[in-house]
């Protein structure tokens, strides 16, 4: 009996755990602190800083099953998903990693044992082929001599991509940095499937499928192309879970493995489809995986960056559901079946299920309003095509008006053997794309970050003042030996009480000082293992190795820590009030206020906001001790500690506990007791995106200041309405009622005035070619009264052309009315356009009524004088 996908995942992790590897949980699909990546797309992403030497772990061997998304940017597989056997937007990457521990021999031996061992995957040895980099004799000989693979099944692959070291079998992180050769393992599905071994002319066939890539990081590539050996070579491997599942379950397509079979059945059930071989079922089954996990990890559909990629995937799935005959919203209904088939790998998704379903349902309902009309327009345009390519302007119009991502339009065209002019589409999109680029941090050069070789010992949990030594200085991003008065710089110390910004808490400010220099710290940031103090030298000269007195701004620090502790109470109160789907999606904690973003699918009701506020204040009054404990990450999770969105944790973590009310992982600085917070007041609750709400609040001194401000405002209002704060509501209601009554009376007077004006005006009408024409400039008449006057004059004159104008605040207001019997000859919209352009304005309307505005008051008399000739020319 073949292994299930869940069993394969667990077997991989168990195998490497037995080989001394730390099992590390999958990181978020939103890369942490890496601006070069749109989404996590490989197992090594979460270890990138380790490979770069910017981070250290307590272990030197690790294994993971990493959730990955490839859709958008360099790794854009979207158009192929559902149409090929192995393309996905979402997949799991099984990996094992060595950080300066074992190297080629053990990495290859481990892979072979797992793949062929009877108690593990037990694959036939004769079915396995391998490739190595052309000059990697060491790996070649390990495969041939130690493992015993026949040399005819070991293929050397050289530089096949146009330049030195540009090869399928040579991996590099970038133009510079860690790199090295790799060896790949292929499975031969048999001669009943077309294709040749890697390196052959038929290598793109489906017979020989790559199942494992093992990268040997042994060089550090310099900017001049020189390859310097790394002092501690490392290993990074990746094996697609879905690919190895297809091999072990004896199927040729990833969509035939147990996980996808069950998902495809669920898709068929919610859409009413009967043909289980439909490619649309495969598209939807794939897309629910990426969409659900992306939303769970904090990505929300939008028109920019990650949110736009998510929106494209969702809308592609919805369109394929439409093709299958789905008549109502269906996509969100697949979250529950997805959780069922993913098993333990979906534990975090299960906690967010209600929120994920709501976001998907809302997005589907919004798109459904335009999908049918957009498809009708596309059908119409395609029916008029004389060639085989839809122009880019039409593709852009579908995107701009109906929300059709270009790949959805390309999907429709593909089914009709047509293409889309994507270059033309990109040209039409340039303004939006430029705006997105300017507002995003993607594409930043990772190497531009300050590289600090030293580490800083943080002492700020217990101290706000400390003697320290300057270990590094940076000016304009470059390391220097000294800085001088007036210069801005980053100062790194061997130990510091200053907190570096992280976890939503802003960095400390304060002062670094000795007998000869004073450095004003405006911010504190983390640089790998070092803590950098950003600011300006206000006096003297500061050099590396100088002793320094580090003093945190204590008053500011105290306000920050109270706000930070309040966010934990707020988080717990929200979960107790709204449900367990609530999860932190971001925060800002500074000395003035706190901002807390969380997952929830609708605006909070006023009574819910009050309940949350009361609950937090109750915990403050309980004056519970705020306790911290350092423990293993797994132990903390077993204790029920919640991890915060987007935060990266070490193996040893700080667990913050506030009585029995809140337990979370947090490395920030906090109050000693909840009572220190004093008071908590919510300023606002709002939405930032679909499925994401935001609360802003103040504590302590800030909350008291808010109460004083509100009290002063009440006193001012009470004075204005000649009452007191005890009966203020009644007084305000009385004032509003009287105001409404006076407004009604005023409107009645204005109507009477307009009627009187109209009655007197009607006698001024003159005959032009037998038609009554009335042209008049009115004084002291509000622009909004002109329409009422035109209607009155039409009734009085019977058949007529009426032009009225008034001025106010150096602006012209115009209106033209034409009775319906005359609109075949004189159209109000045409007449007013002629008048408006003379007074520096524009306008329009129906043939019988049109309005306009202008800015040239001085030109109004001559413009009105021209009306008679214009009308005469039309009659």
Curated annotation (Swiss-Prot):
Pfam families: DHHA1, tRNA-synt_2c, tRNA_SAD
GO terms for MF: alanine-tRNA ligase activity; aminoacyl-tRNA deacylase activity; ATP binding; tRNA binding; zinc ion binding
Keyword Metal-binding recorded: yes
Cellular compartment(s): Cytoplasm
Keyword vocabulary terms for this entry: Aminoacyl-tRNA synthetase, ATP-binding, Cytoplasm, Ligase, Metal-binding, Nucleotide-binding, Protein biosynthesis, RNA-binding, tRNA-binding, Zinc
Binding residue positions for Zn(2+): 564, 568, 666, 670
CDD domains with a match to the protein in the record: AlaRS_core
Cofactor(s) needed by this chain: Zn(2+)
Major localisation: cytoplasm
GO biological process, one term: negative regulation of DNA-templated transcription
Superkingdom, natural source: Bacteria
Record's GO cellular component terms: cytosol
InterPro entries in the record: aa-tRNA-synth_II/BPL/LPL, Ala-tRNA-lgiase_IIc, Ala-tRNA-ligase_IIc_anticod-bd, Ala-tRNA-synth_IIc_core, Ala-tRNA-synth_IIc_N, Ala-tRNA_ligase, Ala_tRNA_ligase_euk/bac, DHHA1_dom
E.C. designation(s): 6.1.1.7
Entry note: cofactor: Binds 1 zinc ion per subunit.
Domain notes: Consists of three domains; the N-terminal catalytic domain, the editing domain and the C-terminal C-Ala domain. The editing domain removes incorrectly charged amino acids, while the C-Ala domain, along with tRNA(Ala), serves as a bridge to cooperatively bring together the editing and aminoacylation centers thus stimulating deacylation of misacylated tRNAs.
Family that this chain belongs to: Belongs to the class-II aminoacyl-tRNA synthetase family.
Family annotation (HAMAP family): Ala_tRNA_synth_B
Self-association and partners: Homotetramer.
Role played: Catalyzes the attachment of alanine to tRNA(Ala) in a two-step reaction: alanine is first activated by ATP to form Ala-AMP and then transferred to the acceptor end of tRNA(Ala). Also edits incorrectly charged Ser-tRNA(Ala) and Gly-tRNA(Ala) via its editing domain.
Protein name stated in the entry: Alanine--tRNA ligase
Biological source species: Yersinia enterocolitica serotype O:8 / biotype 1B (strain NCTC 13174 / 8081)
Organismal lineage: Bacteria, Pseudomonadati, Pseudomonadota, Gammaproteobacteria, Enterobacterales
UniProt gene name: alaS
């Amino acid at each position: 009996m073949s292994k299930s996908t869940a069993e394969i995942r667990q077997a991989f992790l168990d195998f490497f755990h037995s080989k001394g590897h730390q099992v590390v949980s999958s990181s978020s699909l939103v890369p942490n602190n890496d601006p070069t990546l749109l989404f996590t797309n490989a197992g090594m992403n979460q270890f990138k800083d380790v490979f770069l030497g910017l981070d250290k772990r307590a272990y030197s061997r690790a294994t993971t099953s990493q959730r990955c998304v490839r859709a958008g940017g360099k790794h854009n597989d979207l158009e192929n998903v559902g149409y090929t056997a192995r393309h996905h937007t979402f997949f799991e990457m099984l990996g094992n990693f060595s950080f300066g521990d074992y190297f080629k021999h053990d990495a290859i031996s481990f892979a072979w044992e797992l793949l062929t061992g009877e108690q593990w995957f037990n694959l036939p040895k004769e079915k396995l082929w391998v490739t190595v980099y052309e000059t990697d004799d060491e790996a070649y000989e390990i495969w041939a001599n130690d493992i015993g693979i026949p040399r005819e099944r070991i293929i050397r692959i050289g530089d096949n991509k146009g330049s030195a070291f540009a090869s399928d079998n040579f991996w590099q992180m970038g133009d510079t940095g860690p790199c090295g050769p790799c060896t790949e393992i292929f499975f031969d599905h048999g001669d009943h499937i077309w294709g040749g071994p890697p390196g052959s002319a038929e290598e793109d066939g489906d017979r020989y499928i790559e199942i494992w890539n093992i990268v040997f990081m042994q060089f550090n590539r310099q900017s001049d192309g020189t390859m310097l050996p790394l002092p501690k070579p490392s290993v990074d491997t990746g094996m697609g879970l879905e690919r190895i599942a297809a091999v072990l379950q004896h199927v040729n397509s990833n969509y035939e493995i147990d996980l996808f079979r069950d998902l495809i059945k669920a898709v068929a059930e919610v859409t009413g489809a009967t043909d289980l071989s439909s490619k649309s079922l495969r598209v939807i089954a794939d897309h629910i995986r990426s969409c659900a996990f992306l939303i769970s990890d904090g990505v929300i559909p939008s028109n920019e960056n990650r949110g736009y990629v998510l929106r494209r995937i969702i809308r592609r799935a919805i369109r394929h559901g439409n093709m299958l005959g789905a008549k109502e919203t269906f996509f969100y209904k697949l979250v529950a079946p997805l959780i069922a088939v993913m098993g333990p790998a979906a534990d975090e998704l299960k906690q967010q299920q209600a929120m994920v379903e709501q976001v998907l349902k809302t997005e589907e309902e919004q798109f459904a309003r335009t999908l049918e009309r957009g498809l009708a327009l596309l059908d119409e345009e395609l029916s008029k095509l004389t060639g085989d390519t839809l122009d880019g302007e039409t593709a852009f119009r579908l995107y701009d008006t109906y929300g059709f991502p270009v790949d959805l339009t390309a999907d429709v065209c593909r089914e009709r053997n047509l293409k889309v002019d994507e270059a033309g589409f990109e040209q039409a999109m340039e303004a939006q794309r430029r705006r997105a680029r300017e507002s995003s941090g993607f594409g930043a050069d990772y190497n531009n970050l300050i590289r600090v070789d030293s580490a800083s010992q943080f002492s700020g949990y217990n101290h706000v003042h400390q003697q320290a030594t300057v270990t590094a200085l940076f000016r304009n991003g470059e390391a220097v030996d000294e800085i001088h008065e007036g210069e801005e710089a980053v100062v790194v110390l061997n130990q510091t009480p200053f907190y570096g910004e992280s976890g939503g808490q802003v960095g400390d400010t304060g002062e670094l000082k000795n007998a000869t220099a004073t450095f004003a710290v405006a911010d504190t940031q983390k640089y790998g293992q070092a803590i950098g103090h950003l600011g300006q030298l206000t006096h003297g000269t500061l050099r590396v190795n100088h002793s320094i007195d580090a003093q945190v701004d204590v008053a500011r620090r105290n306000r920050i820590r109270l706000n930070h502790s309040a966010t934990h109470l707020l988080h717990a109160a929200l979960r107790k009030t709204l449900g367990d789907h609530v999860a932190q999606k971001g925060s800002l904690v500074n000395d003035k206020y706190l901002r807390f973003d969380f997952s929830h699918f609708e605006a909070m009701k006023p009574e819910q906001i009050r309940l949350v506020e009361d609950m937090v204040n109750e915990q403050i009054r309980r004056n519970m001790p705020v306790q911290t404990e350092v423990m293993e990450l797994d132990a903390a999770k077993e204790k029920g500690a919640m991890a915060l969105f987007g935060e990266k944790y070490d193996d040893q973590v700080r667990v913050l506990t506030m009585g029995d009310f809140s337990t979370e992982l947090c490395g920030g600085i906090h109050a000693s007791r909840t009572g220190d917070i004093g008071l908590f007041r919510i300023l606002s609750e709002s939405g930032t995106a679909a499925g994401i709400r935001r609360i802003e609040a103040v504590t302590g001194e800030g909350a008291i200041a808010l109460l004083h401000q509100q009290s002063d405002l009440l006193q001012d209002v009470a004075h204005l309405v000649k009452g007191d704060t005890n009966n203020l509501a009644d007084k305000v209601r009385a004032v509003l009622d009287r105001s409404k009554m006076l407004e009604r009376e005023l409107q009645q007077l204005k109507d009477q005035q307009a009627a009187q004006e109209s009655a007197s005006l009607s006698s001024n009408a003159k005959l032009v070619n037998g038609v009554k024409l009335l042209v008049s400039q009115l004084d002291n008449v509000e622009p909004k009264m002109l329409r009422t006057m035109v209607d009155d004059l039409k009734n009085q004159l019977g058949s007529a052309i009426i032009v009225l104008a008034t001025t106010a605040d150096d602006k012209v207001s115009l209106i033209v009315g034409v009775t319906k019997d005359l609109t075949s000859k004189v159209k109000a919209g045409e007449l007013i356009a002629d008048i408006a352009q003379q007074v520096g304005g524009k306008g329009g309307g129906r043939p019988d009524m049109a309005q306009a505005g202008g800015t040239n008051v001085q030109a109004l008399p001559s413009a009105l004088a021209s009306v008679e000739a214009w009308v005469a020319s039309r009659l």
